[in-house]
Amino acid sequence: MKYYAGDYDVVVVGAGHAGCEAALAAARIGCKVLICTISLDSVALMPCNPNIGGTAKGHLVREIDALGGEMGVNIDNTFIQSRMLNTSKGPAVHSLRAQADKSRYSNRMKYILENEENVTLKQIEVISIDIENGKVKGILTKNGAYYNAKTVVLATGTYLNARIIIGEVAYSGGPNGLFPAKELTKNLMDLGISIRRFKTGTPARVNKKTIDFSKMIEQPGDEKIVPFSFLTDKLEREQVSCYLTYTNENTHEVIRKNLHRSPMFNGSIEGVGARYCPSIEDKVNRFPDKNKHQVFIEPEGEYTNEMYVSGLSSSLPEEIQVAMYRTVPGLENVEFLRTAYAIEYDCIDPQELKLSLESKNIEGLFSGGQINGSSGYEEAAAQGLIAGINAAMKVKEKDPLLLTRSDGYIGVLIDDLVTKGTNEPYRMMTSRSEYRLLLRQGNADLRLTQKGYDVGLVSEERYKRYINRRESIKSEIERIKNVQITNKKEVNEFLLSLNSSELKKPISLYELIKRPELDYYKVEQLDKGRINLPEDVQEEVNTTAKYEGYIEKQLEQVNQFKKFENKLLPNDIDYSKVYGLRIESVQKLSKIRPMNIGQASRISGVSPADISVLLIYLEHKYK
């Protein structure tokens, strides 16, 4: 028996990383939001790795923060170790990563949601979305409550029809021992939404007291802690170490002898797994010549003995897992606290979405996170943020926020999912972007904070900080362009001491910094008028000066890219009547219905010749 339970502008289904960002974004823009979760104890749960950020993922967190999201602030408040990755490489791929205290991360995010003015957080299982005349009307819960909703954001994570697999044991269950959502998939299929089956997995959690760390390599955090959020001032905190060890031939032998019992290899798993996060049995099978694989031991929090064993994800039977783990140096006497498992779950085809993350077929229905076929907390949070913003824009009858590939990694992520689709859990990598040098984690605010402010999400405090930082960078660049370094004897002696050639004539400090062996910091002695600026400002000034030529080339590429992005394709085009298009192109274009020529050009199966046909068609049809 159903009953009327209330009215909301936005209902968010799921309170994981996507759901939390979606709810907070919509609420902060001014919408009345209901966020539903199967368990109030699983808000912003981290059911797999205990860290935020990493290669490309750190960029996503910075971009979420720049737009006004919460993830960066939350990890800055709850991390137990911080490291900057890829520092030996160029600035485009420098990526921040932090170990989280899982419980504190989850509890703080729950507290933020509970205290956000326009948010109501409830323990509710949503079993159906009510649609009327092709538009969202409301949602129905398992307990019979019906809520009117102007928009709905699906952020169901890995819960839809979730199934846990450990060797020959398989049962219906969500991540971390939680309940699965069993009824919503059927409703989505009845609404005409395509459903696929994906798979992911997680390693065991082991007892810290049973680990011999003396046989491992300690991995401490960085001395200089760099925050994720542009709102966070200097961070100082006592950090907790991680540890590195390796598998060996004994480990691999245990796995090889028991591959027939692995669900990955005996056909018990239907779902497609993540290419870039393989199980240990998959790694051993795929790389038979490799005699060892890295294993990182990572703390799950400050006040727990649970340790995450990164690199040993598995779905082998429990007793085989224990035997296999105990062959690893330092884990000879290890005791399991939680068993490793694989999890299968339902997700949708992201090619049925617009770039706003709204369904092409159901008005007012948005989705974000693993339901869209992605993997990872950061990818989920990024999509949730955009879905939440655009649900709010829909309610307020404003244009959606559409991020392009040149705006940020979030734009790349969404464009890849919606335009190219994915046949496996999608993971963000820096190599997926054509404009890596422009999309640095250090300039995320310069790229995106204005956009966040324009949609009403960025607070006045954040906006003021952004303006101050932007102007500091701009004025410092102008200043060093006007600082002339002469070819005096003491200057040349200083340059020679840095293995840099002598000056033959005066040069600006800005030009001098471009020398490969020099940078903004090394030439401080020559810069008499330098004032003490924040480290992040100095870093941005240094990068802008040193890589100016490369940055300008990428900006030229972006301008060419935008010419195609600005050629809009009407949504009502009948591609079957466009003379000259190949049959495959007609099918792909009709399914995906790209917004512009640029998006059309990135669809698999649409050739450059097809793009030429479309350009000619537009020119003649819409003169």
From Swiss-Prot:
FAD binds at G14, A15, G16, H17, A18, G19. NAD(+) binds at residues 273-287. InterPro entries: FAD/NAD-bd_sf, GIDA_C_N, MnmG, MnmG-rel, MnmG-rel_CS, MnmG_C, MnmG_C_subdom, MnmG_C_subdom_sf. Its main location: cytoplasm. It is found in: Cytoplasm. Pfam families: GIDA, GIDA_C_1st, SAM_GIDA_C. Belongs to the MnmG family. Homodimer. Heterotetramer of two MnmE and two MnmG subunits. This is tRNA uridine 5-carboxymethylaminomethyl modification enzyme MnmG. It comes from Clostridium tetani (strain Massachusetts / E88).
